């Protein structure tokens, strides 16, 4: 059996903010349910890999976008980390550092010919 993918087929990758961005001092990110759970019971996480041990997309996204280019991706789906964007949900104050980060990621994807697809909720809530 031979199958020909359509010319406009989306070849890409996907990532979850909480699983790939990591936690960094000074960026204004608040705590979310996964951060809290990992602090309380790291042994419940496979090989104790938690928010502090990610692929660090937050710091290395430009390298990742270059890899997408090299491997022929034309799209990338990521999620917004609400605990980074609105660190304290009781105030609703938006973290400008997070806005700048997500805008830059989207701009870089577009600049490299990648279609950004954003997911606004992926099983993570602020505390």
PLM regions: where:
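N-terminal carbohydrate-binding accessory modules
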Residues: 1-73
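Substrate-binding cleft and catalytic face of glycoside hydrolase catalytic domains
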Residues: 65-127
């Amino acid at each position: 059996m031979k199958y020909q993918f359509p010319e406009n087929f989306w070849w890409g990758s996907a990532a979850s903010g909480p699983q790939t961005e990591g936690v960094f001092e000074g960026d204004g990110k608040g705590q979310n349910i996964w951060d809290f759970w990992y602090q309380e019971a790291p042994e419940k996480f496979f090989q104790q890999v938690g928010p502090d041990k990610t692929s660090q997309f937050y710091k290395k996204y430009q390298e990742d976008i270059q890899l997408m280019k090299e491997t022929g991706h034309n799209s990338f789906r990521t999620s917004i980390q609400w605990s980074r964007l609105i660190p304290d949900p009781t105030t609703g104050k938006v973290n400008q550092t997070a806005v700048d980060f997500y805008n830059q990621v989207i701009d870089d994807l577009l600049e490299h010919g990648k279609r950004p697809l954003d997911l606004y909720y992926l099983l993570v809530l602020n505390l």
